[in-house]
UniProtKB/Swiss-Prot annotation:
This is Large ribosomal subunit protein bL34. Belongs to the bacterial ribosomal protein bL34 family. GO terms for cellular component: ribonucleoprotein complex; ribosome. Signal peptide: none annotated. Residues 1-44 are annotated as: Disordered. It comes from Desulfitobacterium hafniense (strain Y51). It comes from the Bacteria. GO terms for molecular function: structural constituent of ribosome. The keyword Ribosomal protein applies. The keyword Ribonucleoprotein applies. Pfam families: Ribosomal_L34 (PF00468). GO terms for biological process: translation.
Amino acid sequence: MKRTYQPKNRRHKRVHGFLERMSSTSGRNVLKRRRLKGRKKLSA
């Protein structure tokens, strides 16, 4: 059986990237929370 997770860089960026996060209010909230938490990486 084929495994379910077949990583693709393009999809990873398009779905979880910084610009994608900035494009919606909830995405901006994600970034805000990660900044407050002190994450080194804010997004993929």
